[in-house]
């Protein structure tokens, strides 16, 4: 007997990146920060007592929300803490979209968006990005034409790393007749000289919700802690109505608060990633790859064409992925339109990146 709802029977679940258990693997496939979390986080963990686990955590994670409010110069009521960014995405759909409504996503993008939409019985409107991964002048028009009440835009974009300027996001939010979720999972790695600050949109508009996570920039992917920033009309119903009870635990609240307080330490790792990003992009270009301009902690690299044995760069990309894997290096290969001829490569440490480049050069020579 099958007890699943019909829409669950029809759907395909989210496919996570490989998480190897064997030692020695160079893991450049899931966009984790290659550097450890700050000493303040380690000290906070060591300072916890077993007694701290006996009672339930703060229901609203108020200590963390206060620190986040100070960091972003907003009020505590503009913040919600969640068990990873994925919980916030679920909350947004649960709170603001009726079953059967349309949810718009920029295509290609984070593959969990359509999965969550299907779980909630929503129609997915896929709005194609331009060839250069930009949204295009008519993006807002296409969003509204889809009838979507909710739209997801990841910025910097995944999987390309392209950064959409705040001015374009402001215009999009002003034209879109629904809730615009700006997923800023990778924003910590943006060049500070660009002075990018989409949080200003929260002060100006009531339909913008920004997702931030501690998984990437703060080296806490294993903690599962994120937060949303938005107008109180967006935050309040999630915070007081649709959020799970005690949705973030005692340990994660303490460590996340310590991490955000020690932002200066985390910023040192962001600069290291930016320097390595530039070095790896330059080296890949010299090898014949084409890298999309990235402001994230990864590069989307189109492989150069192989010799006559290979009918397409799609096959060449898959071959490079497999040979890297055979040599203990994991990158991400997406078997989907517009991405089959590319590899998404997380920026690792200097030594990890150097080994990656050596193996890619060997792979190209063999082909």
Which residues fall in each region the model found?
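Conserved PLP-binding active-site segment of the aspartate aminotransferase-like
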Residues: 29, 230, 300-308, 325-364
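PLP-dependent aminotransferase class I/II
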Residues: 60, 207-292
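Active-site phosphate-binding strand-loop segment of PLP-dependent enzymes
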Residues: 125, 131-190
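N-terminal "arm"/small-domain region of PLP-dependent enzymes with the aminotransferase-like
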Residues: 1-55, 70, 147
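Phosphate-binding glycine-rich loop
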Residues: 62-102, 120
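Conserved PLP-anchoring active-site segment centered on the Schiff-base-forming lysine
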Residues: 95-116, 130
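Conserved PLP-binding catalytic core of the aspartate aminotransferase-like
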Residues: 273-274, 286-327, 343, 347
């Amino acid at each position: 007997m099958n007890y699943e709802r019909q829409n669950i029977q029809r759907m395909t679940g989210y496919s996570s990146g490989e998480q190897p258990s064997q030692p020695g693997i160079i893991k450049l496939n899931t966009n984790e920060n290659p550097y450890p979390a700050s000493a303040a986080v380690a000290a906070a963990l060591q300072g916890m007592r077993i007694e701290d686990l006996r009672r339930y955590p703060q229901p609203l994670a108020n200590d963390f929300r206060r620190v986040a409010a100070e960091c972003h110069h907003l009020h505590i009521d503009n913040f919600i803490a969640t068990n990873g960014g994925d919980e916030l995405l679920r909350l947004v759909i649960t709170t603001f979209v009726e079953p059967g409504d349309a949810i718009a996503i920029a295509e290609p993008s984070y593959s969990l968006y359509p999965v969550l939409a299907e779980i909630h019985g929503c129609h997915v409107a896929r709005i194609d990005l331009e060839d250069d991964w930009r949204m295009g002048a008519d993006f807002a028009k296409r969003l509204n034409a889809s009838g979507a009440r909710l739209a997801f835009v990841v910025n910097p974009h995944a999987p390309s790393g392209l950064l959409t300027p705040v001015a374009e996001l402001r215009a999009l939010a002003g034209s879109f007749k629904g809730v615009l979720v700006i997923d800023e999972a990778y924003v910590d790695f943006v060049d500070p000289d660009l002075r990018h600050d989409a949080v200003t949109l929260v002060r100006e508009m009531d339909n913008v919700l920004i997702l931030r996570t501690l998984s990437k920039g703060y080296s806490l992917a294993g903690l599962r802690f994120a937060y949303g920033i938005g107008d109180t009309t967006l935050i309040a119903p999630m915070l007081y109505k649709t959020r799970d009870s005690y949705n973030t635990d005692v340990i994660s609240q303490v460590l996340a608060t310590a991490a955000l307080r020690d932002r200066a330490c985390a910023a040192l790792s962001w600069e290291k990633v930016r320097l390595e990003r530039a070095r790896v992009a330059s080296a890949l270009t010299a090898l014949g790859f084409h890298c999309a301009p990235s402001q994230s902690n990864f590069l989307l690299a189109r492989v150069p064409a192989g010799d006559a044995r290979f009918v397409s760069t799609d096959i060449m990309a898959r071959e490079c992925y497999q040979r890297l894997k055979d040599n203990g290096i994991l990158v991400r290969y997406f078997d989907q339109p517009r991405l089959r001829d590319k590899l998404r490569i997380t920026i690792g440490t200097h030594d990890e990146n150097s080994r990656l480049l050596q193996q890619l050069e060997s792979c190209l020579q063999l082909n």
